Amino acid sequence: MYRTAASRAKALKGILNHNFRASRYASSSAVATSSSSSSWLSGGYSSSLPSMNIPLAGVSLPPPLSDHVEPSKLKTTTLPNGLTIATEMSPNPAASIGLYVDCGSIYETPQFRGATHLLERMAFKSTLNRSHFRLVREIEAIGGNTSASASREQMGYTIDALKTYVPEMVEVLIDSVRNPAFLDWEVNEELRKVKVEIGEFATNPMGFLLEAVHSAGYSGALANPLYAPESAITGLTGEVLENFVFENYTASRMVLAASGVDHEELLKVVEPLLSDLPNVPRPAEPKSQYVGGDFRQHTGGEATHFALAFEVPGWNNEKEAIIATVLQMLMGGGGSFSAGGPGKGMHSWLYLRLLNQHQQFQSCTAFTSVFNNTGLFGIYGCTSPEFASQGIELVASEMNAVADGKVNQKHLDRAKAATKSAILMNLESRMIAAEDIGRQILTYGERKPVDQFLKTVDQLTLKDIADFTSKVITKPLTMATFGDVLNVPSYDSVSKRFR
């Protein structure tokens, strides 16, 4: 057997050598012929090869692409159980599919406290049909990427891969969301990571204060922490997560959104997997009331971190929510050192009037946190402790200046352009496009055209900005401070600085 194989190998080697010599001979003669003249180096034509400027005979050129490409239209289907499937085609070779749920920390009752945070970490773990190892291998086999995100009002699970693997993407995604196993050892492992994450939270003062303004500024559901409190960790188990999912992951509160997928093709795959979800009426959103308040945590150190925030309308008041977004861009801000490159954000209001004028500011930036029916607009700052009182007063004076109409048209035009470019550049990402589809349908019941958003931004005037800011700063103040807070003025004295 081995000799036969060897003789065949020798014969094959002889054929290959013969062909290789013929190839070398042909190549050599071609090179010799073409190199007989160097006119092609100076732009002339080769004597033996056709010019690339002359179309090949018998080859028809394809028609040129159109200068204008019609944007893809959103297609939606609502299953009998109330679940919505929405798709938007794109020319990209890859697709992004997400399952978005109207469920977040606002739906946590005391027995479920911290469940949203842990659910985010338990995404794409073992299911009733797959081990975590098998799940990872299947995702790797199609070159996919998965992610999960949790917020106060919504949960999102996404998968991204080439379009040819849409059935596999859908099956893995739905199995992970519908059939999580919540194995004890996996839950305990993620709880250990949650504890580490909570411990590291104190090293992120801005993130810590953004959580604090919610707990201090609201009473009710929006005051629930997005991050699991340490006191709740011992009560989180696989059974708790299972009950939370059973109560909240119902068909009428889910949207499956996709970017880069044919709608009919997706529908054929999704419908058998999701049509049996229970048709439970969508519950009323838990109530929250903005009240304002004061939060202080003294940890010492060489800096004072503070956040001043006010209530703004939510996304259901679309125009005013857009004004809040433009106002955030107008105020801008950043750090005393621009890590994003020279000039980044240096024409914004806070940069020009605070960071450039007062070196005691290490950072100062505007932020928004907008929900369906309410939201927050505020300014975060970090200064040296001895400058804390003056720094807070300066921030208040800048808010008053905007309310008094001190913003000029140049500032507003720059903020409007920055807002539009940020939205349009984000929507170039298929993952963000799919997320935008899912979250808008959960909020509005439809996806509003981006042109409508851009038109609203274009129509904003200086008076709109001034009137909006004037109304906002009359609401109760929410103030949160962290670090060396000994020199931070009282809540009442800061409140009085806003007219």
Curated annotation (Swiss-Prot):
Cystine crosslinks: none
GO MF term (any one): metal ion binding
Known partners and oligomeric status: Heterodimer of alpha and beta subunits, forming the mitochondrial processing protease (MPP) in which subunit alpha is involved in substrate recognition and binding and subunit beta is the catalytic subunit. Component of the ubiquinol-cytochrome c oxidoreductase (cytochrome b-c1 complex, complex III, CIII), a multisubunit enzyme composed of 10 subunits.
Swiss-Prot/TrEMBL keywords: Chloroplast, Membrane, Mitochondrion, Mitochondrion inner membrane, Plastid, Transit peptide
Superkingdom of origin: Eukaryota
GO biological process: proteolysis
Chief place of localization: plastid
Function statement: Substrate recognition and binding subunit of the essential mitochondrial processing protease (MPP), which cleaves the mitochondrial sequence off newly imported precursors proteins.
GO cellular component: chloroplast; chloroplast stroma; cytosol; mitochondrial inner membrane; mitochondrial intermembrane space; mitochondrial matrix; mitochondrial outer membrane; mitochondrion
Coiled-coil parts of chain: none
Localization annotation: Plastid, Chloroplast stroma; Mitochondrion matrix; Mitochondrion inner membrane
Family the UniProt entry places it in: Belongs to the peptidase M16 family.
Membrane topology: Peripheral membrane protein
UniProt name for this protein: Probable mitochondrial-processing peptidase subunit alpha-2, chloroplastic/mitochondrial
